[in-house]
């Protein structure tokens, strides 16, 4: 019974050992994993290289051509969090559009403020009726309701070419450009005297924006949220991967979202609650046609204010050159405002917020803030849209038809929208200035009142235009390198082993392998080859596209800020790929997609997740069947440094083992043992052995002499003869009488000293022979005992095997009996099997004991042989 229990325990331990085998760290290359990043983006545009428009010139100098075959890959079973307030692309686009704006409206002169006292009187201007040629408006637009700006004729003294003389100059200024001196009715100054430096435009500019796209460099990608209910922040479950954004117009405007993209389904309100200036951005699903126009002619004069510096002003006025208007269809405008308020209510109610059912304008501040400000053909329009919004009410019953007209003014002194500065631009151009745009949304902020209620208020934050356009995008860095536990271990290095190299070819699209991001780790790892090929293919393809685009327009490219960005994007991709390959090489995984290692996996390296827990018996199976690579990467993110270090140490040890193995590889062939280059080595070994034996003999002789000296003997060599001297006083005769003294007898000496040396060498060789003979005899006895043990073990195994077969056959035959008989026979068979197993187990134990005793007696036999040889 005890034997049966022991066998059962052994079987259980064996089964458990098989079930809980060791897992090792395995490196995977080509897994669908990404992390948020902020790389240098580059732009693409469909610019006309033949156009001399400054915006087209800027685009051809700084942007690559559009990809003729843009692609988009949908990620299944993936949910990602988006937040438009944390999108760094908005700030980057603001800086780029600021550069574009300054290049298009390039000021070439910095002027000291024209701050001299002027005596001004109001003058009359000739009014003119404006006719509209658009089909969306009525044939004639009556602008009598739009007040004319007052024009003042101002006189001041100016220094002539002779510094000690002055002359009086007359110039015309708009009332909005001058400010009255306190306490004096006729004394005025220019309005910009509180600015230290102003810039003035040299030539009249035009600005016809074309859409540009922002693209991620190779090794990076753009995630795009396609959820229809996304409103600026939250989880997005419908995600796709793109290389570039959609075309975004570099519009510079406040309050209204012009020429942007439209929502696919219904109007949406984007809102992310922040501490200050909370943006409330509305995007329509149907655009509104907007027409803005200014007609009239004028001539311009100039005032010389210093060497090479000229201040342009109005000399002769024909009509009001700053008077303009914008018009929309009333029905379309009010309908879209209804949709906008409904979208705002939906978004705010989802956040448990209340909204005032009205649209407001800021009452105080710069004119760019209190009015609708935009640029049309190089002219800056300031439009008052209060009558468009104040006439709208929620839940109104009457439908308004016709055309809504808003009064606008053109200004010459403009506040910069991106930085704190001002610019003085040339007076309005001659002829008609007319623009057609599409209103695609509203740019507002949510102002909170004392009742914790929000009021939509039109905003002058220009970058909010790009914020809503880029709200659905996120830049990520693709990280195809990951580690995970697998039961496989890196095999040991063998001699003459050549590592097979697998070429990673170019095949699929770059971002296509991210389509497996929603699959489990086990399912995604099956397609690692295709995914890694897609990764490398995409890097190479994107670099090739970039080079082709640069070569196509290299005669126009200049190494500007954007030119440097293009080079940075290219170098970033190459450096990223080289970095991954260097890590793989350090771990001994170069050119491998799945690389096993000898580093045991530690459970503490991965954090617990809601899907898989460390205490689960099937933890590793849970990882591969339930987690995605993206989820797994987040669990091991904090331990990657430790894992990478251990992988590098393991590879270093592997290289050392390989070096030692290569040193032994020269003995792998039997013929190499007879190589003539090894003979000197053999002779050296023989000399060492002989010297060791001689030294051992000398040492034993010294020990023997010391032993005899301690017993009182004279230390003489055993082979040197000595004469036995006789006492001279002792008679040498025989008994019975005295006789004469006998002569002293000498023992004959050996033939010579070499005989003594020969005798020692003979004894030494005999001792060596006897020692080796004893050793070989002991080894032979041990091998015989081991052979007998193996034979006995094999015989026992055969008997056990036959007995088991017989028992199985008996069990099969007995299975046809009744239940009671089967129970009795089964118990008997188990008892018999237990008794028999105990018998051969004892035999094995006895054999092992016999072998162990033989091995243990080997030193004793050697010692006995040495004693026999030395004595």
Swiss-Prot record:
Q: Which keywords does this chain's UniProt record carry?
A: Apoptosis, Cleavage on pair of basic residues, Coiled coil, Disulfide bond, Fusion of virus membrane with host membrane, Glycoprotein, Host cell membrane, Host endosome, Host membrane, Host-virus interaction, Membrane, Signal, Transmembrane, Transmembrane helix, Viral attachment to host cell, Viral envelope protein, Viral penetration into host cytoplasm, Virion, Virus entry into host cell
Its function?
Answer: The surface protein gp120 (SU) attaches the virus to the host lymphoid cell by binding to the primary receptor CD4. This interaction induces a structural rearrangement creating a high affinity binding site for a chemokine coreceptor like CCR5. This peculiar 2 stage receptor-interaction strategy allows gp120 to maintain the highly conserved coreceptor-binding site in a cryptic conformation, protected from neutralizing antibodies. These changes are transmitted to the transmembrane protein gp41 and are thought to activate its fusogenic potential by unmasking its fusion peptide. Surface protein gp120 (SU) may target the virus to gut-associated lymphoid tissue (GALT) by binding host ITGA4/ITGB7 (alpha-4/beta-7 integrins), a complex that mediates T-cell migration to the GALT. Interaction between gp120 and ITGA4/ITGB7 would allow the virus to enter GALT early in the infection, infecting and killing most of GALT's resting CD4+ T-cells. This T-cell depletion is believed to be the major insult to the host immune system leading to AIDS.
Residue intervals annotated with topology Extracellular? 22-684
Ranges for the region named V4 are 383-408
Task: Note what the entry says on domains.
Answer: Some of the most genetically diverse regions of the viral genome are present in Env. They are called variable regions 1 through 5 (V1 through V5). The 17 amino acids long immunosuppressive region is present in many retroviral envelope proteins. Synthetic peptides derived from this relatively conserved sequence inhibit immune function in vitro and in vivo.
Keyword Signal present in the record's keywords: the answer is yes
The segment annotated Immunosuppression runs over 567-583
Query: Region entry V1: which residue ranges?
Result: 120-153
Query: Which protein are we looking at?
Result: Envelope glycoprotein gp160
- Tell me which GO cellular component terms the UniProt record holds: host cell endosome membrane; host cell plasma membrane; membrane; viral envelope; virion membrane
Q: Where is this region: V5?
A: 451-458
Which BP terms does GO give this entry?
membrane fusion involved in viral entry into host cell; symbiont entry into host cell; virion attachment to host cell
């Amino acid at each position: 019974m005890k034997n049966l229990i022991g066998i059962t325990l052994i079987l259980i331990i064996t089964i458990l050992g098989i079930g809980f085998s060791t897992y090792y760290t395995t490196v995977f290359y080509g897994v669908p994993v990404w992390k948020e990043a902020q790389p240098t983006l580059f732009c693409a545009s469909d610019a006309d290289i033949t156009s001399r428009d400054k915006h087209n010139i800027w685009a051809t100098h700084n942007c690559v051509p559009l990809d003729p075959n843009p692609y988009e890959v949908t990620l299944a079973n993936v949910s990602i969090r988006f937040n438009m307030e944390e999108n760094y692309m908005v700030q980057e686009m603001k800086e780029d559009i600021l550069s574009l704006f300054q290049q298009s409206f390039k000021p070439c002169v910095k002027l000291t403020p024209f701050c001299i006292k002027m005596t001004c009187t109001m003058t009359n201007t000739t009014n003119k009726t404006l006719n509209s040629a658009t089909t969306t408006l009525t044939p004639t637009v009556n602008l009598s309701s739009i007040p004319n700006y007052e024009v003042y004729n101002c006189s001041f003294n100016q220094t002539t070419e002779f510094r000690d003389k002055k002359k009086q100059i007359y110039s015309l200024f708009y009332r909005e450009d001058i400010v009255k001196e306190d306490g004096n009715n006729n004394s005025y100054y220019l309005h910009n005297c509180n600015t230290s430096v102003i810039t003035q435009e040299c030539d009249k500019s035009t600005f016809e924006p074309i859409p540009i796209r922002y693209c991620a460099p190779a090794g990076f990608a753009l995630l795009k949220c396609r959820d229809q209910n996304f409103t600026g922040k939250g989880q997005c479950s419908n995600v796709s991967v793109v290389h570039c954004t959609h075309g975004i117009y570099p519009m510079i405007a406040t309050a209204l979202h012009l020429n942007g993209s439209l929502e696919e389904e219904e109007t949406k309100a984007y809102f992310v609650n922040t501490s200050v200036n909370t943006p409330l951005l509305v995007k329509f699903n149907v655009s509104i046609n907007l027409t803005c126009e200014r007609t009239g002619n004028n001539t311009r004069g100039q005032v010389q204010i210093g060497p090479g510096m000229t201040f342009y002003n109005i000399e002769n006025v024909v009509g009001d050159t700053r008077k303009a208007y914008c018009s929309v269809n009333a029905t379309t405008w009010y309908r879209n405002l209804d949709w906008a308020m409904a979208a705002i209510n939906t978004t705010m109610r989802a956040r448990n917020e209340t909204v005032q059912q009205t649209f407001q304008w800021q009452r105080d501040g710069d004119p760019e803030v209190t009015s609708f400000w935009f640029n049309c053909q190089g002219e800056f329009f300031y439009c008052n849209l209060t009558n468009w919004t104040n006439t709208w009410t929620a839940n109104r019953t009457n439908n308004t038809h016709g055309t809504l007209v808003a009064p606008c003014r053109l200004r010459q002194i403009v506040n910069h929208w991106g930085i704190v500065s001002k610019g003085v631009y040339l007076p309005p151009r001659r002829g008609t200035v007319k623009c057609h745009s599409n209103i695609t949304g509203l740019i507002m902020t949510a102002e909170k009142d004392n009742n914790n209620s929000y009021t939509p208020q039109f905003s002058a934050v220009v970058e909010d235009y790009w914020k809503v356009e880029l709200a659905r995008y996120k830049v990520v860095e693709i990280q195809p390198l990951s580690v995970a536990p697998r039961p496989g271990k890196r095999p040991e290095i063998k001699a003459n082993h050549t590592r097979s190299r697998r070429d990673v070819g170019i095949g699929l699209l770059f971002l296509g392998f991210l389509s497996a991001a929603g699959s489990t780790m086990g399912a995604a790892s099956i397609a690692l080859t295709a995914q890694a090929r897609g990764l490398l293919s995409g890097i190479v393809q994107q670099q090739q596209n970039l080079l082709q685009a640069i070569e196509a327009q290299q005669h126009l490219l200049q190494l500007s800020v954007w030119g440097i960005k293009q080079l940075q994007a290219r170098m970033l991709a190459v450096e990223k790929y080289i970095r991954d390959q260097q890590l793989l090489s350090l771990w001994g995984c170069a050119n491998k997609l799945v690389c096993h290692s000898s580093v045991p996996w530690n459970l503490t390296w991965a954090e617990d997740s809601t899907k898989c827990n460390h205490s689960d018996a099937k933890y590793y199976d849970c990882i591969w069947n339930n987690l995605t690579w993206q989820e797994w990467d987040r669990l091991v993110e904090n331990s990657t440094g430790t894992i990478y270090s251990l992988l590098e140490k393991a590879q270093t040890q592997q290289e050392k083992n390989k070096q030692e193995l290569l040193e032994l590889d020269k003995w792998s062939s039997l013929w190499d043992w007879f190589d003539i280059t090894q003979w000197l080595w053999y002779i050296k070994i023989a000399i060492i052995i002989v010297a060791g034996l001689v030294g051992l003999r000398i040492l034993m002789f010294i020990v023997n002499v010391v032993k005899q000296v301690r017993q009182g003997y004279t230390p003489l060599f055993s082979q040197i003869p000595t004469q036995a001297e006789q006492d001279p006083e002792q008679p040498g005769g025989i008994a019975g009488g005295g006789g004469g003294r006998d002569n002293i007898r000498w023992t004959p000496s050996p033939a010579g000293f070499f005989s003594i040396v020969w005798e020692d060498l003979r004894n030494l060789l005999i001792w060596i022979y006897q020692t080796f003979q004893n050793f070989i005899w002991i080894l032979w006895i041990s091998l015989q005992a081991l052979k007998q043990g193996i034979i006995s073990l094999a015989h026992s195994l055969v008997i056990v095997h036959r007995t088991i077969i017989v028992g199985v056959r008996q069990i099969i035959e007995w299975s046809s009996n009744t239940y009671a008989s089967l129970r009795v026979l089964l118990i008997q068979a188990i008892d018999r099997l237990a008794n028999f197993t105990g018998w051969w187990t004892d035999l094995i134990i006895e054999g092992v004991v016999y072998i162990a005793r033989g091995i243990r007696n080997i030193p004793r036999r050697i010692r006995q042989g040495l004693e026999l040889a030395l004595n």
